[in-house]
Amino acid sequence: MPAVVVVGAQWGDEGKGKATDQLGSRVDYVVKFNGGNNAGHTVVIGDEKYALHLLPSGILTPDVTPVIGNGVVVDLEVLFEELRDLNTRGVDTSRLQISAGAHLIPPYNRTLDKVTERFLGKRQIGTTGRGIGPTYADKMSRVGIRVQDLFDEKILREKVEGALTLKNQILVKVYNRRAVTIDETVDALLEYADRVRPMVVDTSLVLNQALDRGETVLFEAGQATMLDVDHGTYPFVTSSSATAAGACTGSGIGPTRIDRVIGVIKAYTTRVGEGPFPTELDGDDGEYLRKTGGEYGVTTGRARRTGWYDAVIARYASRVNGLTDFVLTKLDVLTGLEKVPVAVAYDVDGERFDEMPPDQSAFHHATPIYEYLDGWWEDITHARTFDDLPVNAQRYVEHLESVSGTRISAIGVGPDREATIPRYDLLSG
């Protein structure tokens, strides 16, 4: 059975949670391999809506083992808040496994994240202020705190002391904040040690053994391709690897283990925070997409920026991830439009780019070149086969498939769990 990676193919909020939830009933493990609680995904089951930020969406599916990999940064307070909320709603969370190598978000990094963003003013990146970036910076600077450190107070105290030597200088002398004490930080972290201990495993070993047994493992990316620290619109990106490659480094499996890579992509485009966005709409069309699509962040509540479908980005995401399939979401949001534009290339100072411009400056100044397709007015939320869709909706999907270069294997036509049209089997190909 396969290892399948699910990634966002735009700037996030594409509906990865729904896609992984759809596959979840057919897999044995669902693994979150990057990011933290800086992104959220919503899963609707019947009348219940679940907004998850740190936990893998597989936790909602009985008999599936949800895993938090070593590439994730964990806020323990948020972790246990989410677990408590799910428990009160009758969800069994006892199967959760967490990598001993995952890094922890200490309280001082949340503080640093918020004050740094305010300090940057107009140059701010648009972070969520949850300490994600500073914690990944600690990881790369080799002053980070890992889950396994909770079980040796001496090591934990030494690591906190080492980190605070510099961080207190910044807090006090740059931001005019009070110094953080070693004791308050250690106490805040140790509060969770006994509760988290039963969940901690060597996730690399667990996942490789599962694949050896022929079980199916699904890896879900946080954020998205265009927010990837290497391949996204740098510096307006997240701090982790949000492409398919991150599934390997963030969980401890080798690249030859991966069988399929699925990109989740909206029928239009959205973005939260700062950074370039070639197809962005500022007028009535943008507001229509925002209101009809409910485009407000699960984690922040911020209104998302909206724009038309961008095939240049879709082709780029397919290339850097090695996509085998697209899952197209929110097709129903486009119902009622007379014409639906699709960006197929960019114009940059009179030069046409059919692929992503090689430098960030050109991308900032890119003007989309559109093709226009006829819209449809029929309600498609109850469509369950491709033939149930209006002819113009079918043509739109087929056109996106053609200009994006990767087959569309499933189509989302509403928020409900069942509101999905399968075209090809995502697990077997």
From Swiss-Prot:
Its EC number is 6.3.4.4. It is found in: Cytoplasm. Mg(2+) binds at residues 13, 40. GO terms for biological process: 'de novo' AMP biosynthetic process; IMP metabolic process. GTP binds at residues 12-18, 40-42, 304, 330-332, 412-414. GO terms for molecular function: adenylosuccinate synthase activity; GTP binding; magnesium ion binding. GO terms for cellular component: cytoplasm. The active site is at residues 13, 41. It catalyses: IMP + L-aspartate + GTP = N(6)-(1,2-dicarboxyethyl)-AMP + GDP + phosphate + 2 H(+). Pathway: Purine metabolism; AMP biosynthesis via de novo pathway; AMP from IMP: step 1/2. Substrate binds at residues 298-304. It comes from the Bacteria. SUPFAM superfamilies: P-loop containing nucleoside triphosphate hydrolases. CDD domains: AdSS. Its cofactor is Mg(2+). HAMAP family: Adenylosucc_synth. Homodimer. PANTHER family: ADENYLOSUCCINATE SYNTHETASE. Belongs to the adenylosuccinate synthetase family. Plays an important role in the de novo pathway of purine nucleotide biosynthesis. Catalyzes the first committed step in the biosynthesis of AMP from IMP. NCBIfam families: PRK01117.1, purA. This is Adenylosuccinate synthetase. It comes from Beutenbergia cavernae (strain ATCC BAA-8 / DSM 12333 / CCUG 43141 / JCM 11478 / NBRC 16432 / NCIMB 13614 / HKI 0122). The gene is purA.
